Amino acid sequence: TSAGLTRNLLMFICDAYEEQKVADKGNDDDWRTVLHFHPVIAPITVAVLPLMKKDGLAELAQDIQAELREDFRTDYDQAGAIGKRYRRQDEAGTPFCVTVDYDSKEDGTVTLRFRDSMQQIRVPRSELSNRIRTEIKNYTRV
């Protein structure tokens, strides 16, 4: 039909797609591609990214992903530089990234990054699921 699923899907993708110029350390040609899917319809709700593969960060990140997987659609990515991993998740439309770093081992907090604003905040691991739920509930596109 003329109002079929394909047209609706294309409409969501076209509306969500954006190329943004990013201010980056003197590089005038730095762009990022973002799919601004609402968190409810994003294929991946949250990606868990260890800062490094060593020193137990990967194992800690996998534990956190297992916890988040109970409530959200998750992804785990440890390949490449953290900035490139953020960009891959932006392109996939993932609204939230959780970065596990050395402070995570020390104080039990993680970095929660927001796709649309690229803002990063520290969140206690014990409050992470609730914080993501709250962010989804209050989501407005920037």
Task: Give the role of each language-model region.
Residues T1-V142:
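NTP/phosphate- and nucleic-acid-binding module
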